[in-house]
């Protein structure tokens, strides 16, 4: 931070309050590089009460436990079970690894919250933000790759299955694509990683009022949010359109044959593929929007809008949303995979999982049933 920044922090507007000990401000007690790393915006706010830090720490402990256990089981089962090592499931495995990384950095946040501030310093901040960049951007692009895989498999059932080599190239592409956006701020070539909110978490700088910062925010928003979101919407819209058209053709043919349905397994206990795929597509889009839209909007407001809207408490909400989705994903999707549940049932009978052998689900796992787990495991 330059001299102007330090003068701002120690300015007359806070000196009376600080000398009287009336209000503890964010950043109090920090010096040198740690103080210089904090955007001026946060230094104008009072420190949050200890109860806020405690509540967030407890919430993150719960998220961390659920995410590490859930994603850890997905990684273990999918990587050690031969029948689950299909090309499509490599993408599910990569997504679980990224979600695991997302929450593996949570102890830094929990420690900062326990110490009520920027306790880990700049080094811990850089590690936290680097892991967040790789896991966040990588998860978005992996979701886009999964959407492409599902679209290819469902719309071209005869020749749409992706080869193992192609999927591995897609996984490599995800990590290569994420690397510049993760390393450029770390090396301070373009952008930088800074504390945010209660100074217990770190992200890329979206508050410094410079052209370089604004350009970086615009580019990373486009490449890490708009691009994968557009792909996800395009591919899942294509899936829904294809399935609805197929269902309409079946109904028309059944009408011509004067039968109620051409489906052999029609019954109240079995949802049609139309409904299953529509639900999967809607849920995938919703989770991606719910997890990253708040953060994207916050970054845009910080760079181009009214920064006064971004109070420390408000900016903690997007961070919680991202962690919640990393926690929920394995439980909502991969654990619904019939073959995955059967493997859990075999290895961990004490979980009391009741998953009967379902030959229909197994046989159709390449077309409809695999869509939900591959969406955002």
Swiss-Prot record:
InterPro entries: GPCR_opsins (IPR050125), GPCR_Rhodpsn (IPR000276), GPCR_Rhodpsn_7TM (IPR017452), Opsin (IPR001760)
SUPFAM superfamilies referenced in this protein's UniProt entry, alphabetically: Family A G protein-coupled receptor-like
Compositional bias of kind Low complexity: 361-377
GO molecular function terms listed in the Swiss-Prot or TrEMBL record: G protein-coupled receptor activity; photoreceptor activity
Region (Disordered): 355-377
Pfam family, one: 7tm_1
Coiled coil: none
Keyword Lipid biosynthesis: no
Compartments it resides in: Membrane
BP GO terms, sorted: phototransduction; visual perception
Keywords annotated in UniProt: Chromophore, Disulfide bond, G-protein coupled receptor, Glycoprotein, Membrane, Photoreceptor protein, Receptor, Retinal protein, Sensory transduction, Transducer, Transmembrane, Transmembrane helix, Vision
Cytoplasmic side: 79-89, 147-166, 236-283, 336-377
Topology of this chain in the membrane: Multi-pass membrane protein
Paired cysteines (S-S): 125-202
Side of membrane Extracellular, spans: 1-57, 111-126, 188-214, 305-314
GO CC field: membrane
PANTHER family with a match to the protein in the record: OPSIN
Protein name: Opsin-2
Species name: Manduca sexta
Source lineage: Eukaryota, Metazoa, Ecdysozoa, Arthropoda, Hexapoda
